[in-house]
Amino acid sequence: MGHPNIEQRKFTFCSMLAAYDLEHLITQCPECTRFFAACCPHETFGGDLALPNKKICHHFQLVFIDGACSNNGRDNAKAGLGMTIGDDEEYCWSITMEDAVDPDGPRTNQCAELLAAIEGLKQLENVNRIQAIDKAMGKGDSHHKPARRHTNDLRSTYIVVADSEYVVKGITEWFPTWRVRLS
């Protein structure tokens, strides 16, 4: 059911990619400017790194997120979120944390980081939904497709890229416990 590159909601690149620098593993589509994780270079799959000038596989969709807070945890704390899925302005968002976004408790760095991950995934899903509607109406572009080996997957895989250990552990280790507590 799952993908071999994802275990406990944590993405890792295929071991065949170990020789590549991270800058080569994060790809950007020249047509839509969105960010993606490189597919495996096994020649049998014809992955992104196997052939020069190959079209970018749009399966592993990346959302880069960050959250920040000044006066962390105090009454006068100010916090904000930043998310991007590509270079175009339409793919970059910043949100001020206000009561409408986070009505409970004081503003904190950790809360801002987690909300950035949630909002980033929402934005990514919204963009994909709009593109699917456009495609269904004959307005969409045809380059947004996964490599051959992903054609049986019903959905693309969304990957949150964060510099926050709290977010990474929250998604990969603590999420099952949080889900049980909230249900």
Where does each model-flagged region fall?
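RNase H catalytic domain
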Residues: 69-72, 118-183
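RNase H-like nuclease fold core
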Residues: 4-5, 14-115, 122-130
